[in-house]
Amino acid sequence: SKIGLLGHSQGGVVASMTAGILASRGESPDALVLIAPGSVIQDACMGGRFFGAEFNPADPPEYVKCFGIMKLGREYILTTQELDIYGTAKAYTGPVRLIHGSKDTIVPMYCSEKFIETYTQDAELITVEGENHMITRKLKTVVSHAVSFFASQLI
């Protein structure tokens, strides 16, 4: 049986790194879909500014509050600073589809573009015009891009 991984935002970072770790163990998934993969989290944690929260990146507090509601802990911030996101991800050499909204103001397009550079093999980036980060405008289009890719790779 074949396996595909999909992740959105921070889940895209998790899916990309999981695919890389599995590939390095000889257990590579058969397809990977990343929707607005949020590798910007590393820049934010290293820069001391995470979506409304400001902190000393070398000595973050016990937790910071982002978006006014979400708490991120000190260990999350410190661990994220040290992740080798792209280095881990590049061990995966299977087919990849990246999907990113043109109006995403949370995860910049450069994050998906960097993944395209990382995956030098069978990788493509689909830009969904007018879509935001939360996929509230063209959900059916985004889902269709993911499902059609998995259907072509896994069935």
Q: What residue ranges belong to the model's regions?
A:
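The alpha/beta-hydrolase serine catalytic core
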Residues: 2-4, 20, 26-127, 131-152
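Gly/Ala-rich beta-loop-alpha elbow adjacent to hydrolase catalytic centers
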Residues: 7-11, 15
